[in-house]
Amino acid sequence: MNKILWKPANKSDTHINKFIDMVNTTYYQDLQTYDDLYHWSINNISHFWKASLEYSKIEYQGTYENVLDNLKMDINVKWFSGVNLNFAENLLVHRDDKIAIISKVEDYPSRQISYRELYKQVEKLSSALRELGVKKGDRVAGFMPNILEAVIAMLATTSIGAIWSSSSPDFGIISVSDRF
């Protein structure tokens, strides 16, 4: 596919360009292109991920000494050891009327939900889960299709610090049973 689908009006306003500028300033580099950034990232894994965390402004608690404990990328790598973050906290940081999610389900009309409404619905469900006794570390499983309400349930669960697991009914009884 060679057709350009979208091109930014001003390259300097893009996040990738702003990130490259930050890397250049922080690490005394002269990266100019995405390809330059890519090569720098694979040769400077810890610096790249530290810069990514800083640029993204992800909220977290704790401190880390090392970005990762093993430069060999295997299944036992520990990233930002000593740091905890809450998925829902970071996804629910916005509370305005901009569109947060567009839901498209086969044979149904599209639905949209704003950040404000998403926050309200997550807050309402997380309160109900707390009233049921769900607390940090508990497990909550959802047997539901991949629809907007599943996202709300996941965010409500993780906002408490509980662990969310879901399975769509399309998987069939045996697959769902194996998964849970």
How should each PLM-predicted stretch be described?
Residues 161:
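Structured binding elements
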Residues 1-75:
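N-terminal amphipathic, basic-rich helices that act as targeting or association modules
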Residues 23-28, 88-117:
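AMP-dependent adenylate-forming
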Residues 42, 50-63, 81-102:
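A short N-terminal helical cap/helix-turn-helix that marks the beginning
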Residues 158:
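Anion (oxyanion) recognition and catalysis
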Residues 36-40, 101-155, 172-177:
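Conserved AMP-binding/adenylate-forming core of the ANL superfamily
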